[in-house]
């Protein structure tokens, strides 16, 4: 699966996000269940359940004392919830994440290869302005062969 690009969308007053059509057909190949979560509470990540299950399998192989695993699970569980796509192509963003990420009204939905990232539009614009792309970023990508 290769989700890419950005599509503006809206989160309605009930906290539902209509998945943009440009992403919906690709996602439906993986079914109607998703895991919505966050690591920071600033944005939402929407994983097809199959992709999230692969992440969980990798985590299960790590020792329970692994600090990074524990932090990851605490955050993704706190913000996370299994959701189902409704008949109108919408998912319900968990209330705790919706409040933390300020997801009301205008949002941007980014395709990040195998998951979607959803951010408050104002936060996206601020992030682009305050975190400019630099030559160090170019160098880091070059070191990765990109």
PLM region spans:
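Flexible "stalk/tail and boundary" regions
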Residues: 1-9, 13, 23-88, 96-146
